[in-house]
């Protein structure tokens, strides 16, 4: 009998991508996050689909429709909690996935990396428009503050902001279009993820040592499907613990109040996964400067491969670069904390110092560390 898995046109693609794919024999648990992100995306699309059946994108009924989902729809509370906390899990996996890419030099696969950065931006846009939909206080004011940043663009800014709003302020038209965006963007994310995988399979996976693994490859199934299954078990465990025992711990209490344009919350802040970028935005007193710094904080990932100066790909055997990498990680955690604090001393100065250090580490210190390590590895005799 002919093996259908290897001959059928459609099954053949799946086989080459997930079953008979040659994978390096030494990839660690840090390589689990790609599959975890795929599962997170499927969870978000499925839970979002069921939420969309009951949600109404109208300013008068949006808030009560979310309350109706939680109170009256069968397992609506569970679907909503899985969707809200699934987004947090998605971003946790995303940040770890990007961190792994920086640590092990995966950015040198430039097509895969650049598509990945576009994916990150698309997922961030999806999460932002999704956060607006429950039409609570923080949803409304978050949308107002972030979309208002467009008005900082010279000459066309105000027109652009009003075009996005569909009026002179965030209102019914904004909510309706944000719901449309939130529905379509995940499918664009799926398409980009397929392109991301396509480019990855052109080169094959990187590995912790950073050297060419072609001489030692093993089939993806069963070795890495089993390994990914363990990661999945942990993902589901954490997600279910969050969704069932502490569903609102990562949300904002202000979002339990319906949106009120006449009452501004004392501290406007986005979800936790945007706080690092929000802290960088707030650390610059000038509006346009803040917007540019916010964009630069993410888009800097596109030029990271131009800043690679080391002769070795991975940081596994580069202690100076390793130290700077973990300082960068601590710095991002500090920025996340600062983003959630009020705009007052000492938080202002800490945020400004952390923002400066973020750009200094990536643009100056890490390339210099690479050059220093090259020099130290040269034979001196």
UniProtKB/Swiss-Prot annotation:
Keyword Iron: yes
Chief place of localization: mitochondrion
GO CC terms, sorted: mitochondrial inner membrane; respiratory chain complex III
An individual GO BP term: mitochondrial electron transport, ubiquinol to cytochrome c
Membrane topology: Multi-pass membrane protein
Cofactor: heme b
InterPro entries for this protein: Cyt_b/b6_C (IPR005798), Cyt_b/b6_C_sf (IPR036150), Cyt_b/b6_N (IPR005797), Cytb/b6-like_sf (IPR027387), Cytochrome_b (IPR030689), Cytochrome_b_C_euk/bac (IPR048260), Cytochrome_b_N_euk/bac (IPR048259), Di-haem_cyt_TM (IPR016174)
PROSITE patterns: CYTB_CTER (PS51003), CYTB_NTER (PS51002)
Residue ranges of the TM segments: 33-53, 77-98, 113-133, 178-198, 226-246, 288-308, 320-340, 347-367
Entry binding sites for heme b b566: 97, 196
Family: Belongs to the cytochrome b family.
Subunit annotation: The cytochrome bc1 complex contains 11 subunits: 3 respiratory subunits (MT-CYB, CYC1 and UQCRFS1), 2 core proteins (UQCRC1 and UQCRC2) and 6 low-molecular weight proteins (UQCRH/QCR6, UQCRB/QCR7, UQCRQ/QCR8, UQCR10/QCR9, UQCR11/QCR10 and a cleavage product of UQCRFS1). This cytochrome bc1 complex then forms a dimer.
Name this polypeptide is given: Cytochrome b
Organism: Antechinus flavipes
């Amino acid at each position: 009998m002919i093996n259908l898995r290897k001959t059928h046109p459609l099954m053949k693609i799946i086989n080459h991508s997930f079953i008979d794919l040659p994978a390096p024999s030494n990839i660690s648990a840090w390589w689990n996050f790609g599959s975890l992100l795929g599962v997170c995306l499927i969870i978000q699309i499925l839970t979002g689909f069921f939420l969309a059946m009951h949600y109404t994108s109208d300013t008068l009924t949006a808030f009560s429709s979310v309350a109706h989902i939680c109170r009256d729809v069968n397992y609506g509370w569970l679907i909503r909690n899985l969707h809200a906390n699934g987004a947090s899990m998605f971003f946790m996996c995303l940040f770890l996935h990007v961190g792994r890419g920086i640590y092990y030099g995966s950015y040198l696969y430039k097509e895969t990396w650049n598509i990945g950065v576009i994916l990150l931006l698309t997922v961030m846009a999806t999460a932002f428009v999704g956060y607006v939909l429950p039409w609570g206080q923080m949803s409304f004011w978050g949308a107002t503050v972030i979309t208002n940043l467009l008005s900082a663009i010279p000459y066309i800014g105000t027109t652009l902001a009003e075009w996005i709003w569909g009026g002179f302020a965030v209102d019914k038209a904004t909510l309706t279009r944000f719901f449309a965006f939130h529905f379509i963007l995940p499918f664009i994310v799926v398409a980009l993820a397929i392109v991301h995988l396509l480019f990855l399979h052109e080169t094959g996976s990187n590995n912790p040592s950073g050297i060419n693994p072609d001489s030692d490859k093993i089939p993806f199934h069963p070795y890495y499907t089993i390994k990914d299954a363990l990661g999945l078990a942990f993902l589901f465990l954490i997600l279910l613990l969050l969704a069932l025992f502490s569903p609102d711990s990562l949300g904002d209490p202000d979002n339990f109040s319906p949106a009120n344009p006449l009452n501004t919350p004392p501290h406007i802040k986005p979800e936790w996964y945007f706080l690092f970028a929000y802290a960088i935005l707030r650390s610059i007193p000038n509006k346009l400067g803040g917007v540019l710094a916010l964009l630069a904080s993410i888009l800097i990932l596109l030029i990271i491969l131009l800043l690679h100066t080391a002769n070795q790909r991975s940081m596994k055997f580069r202690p100076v670069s390793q130290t700077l990498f973990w300082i960068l990680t601590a710095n991002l955690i500090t920025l996340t904390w600062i983003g959630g604090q009020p705009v007052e001393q000492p938080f202002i100065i800490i945020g400004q110092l952390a923002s400066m250090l973020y750009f200094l580490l990536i643009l100056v210190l890490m390339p210099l560390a690479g050059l220093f390590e090259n020099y130290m590895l040269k034979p001196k005799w």
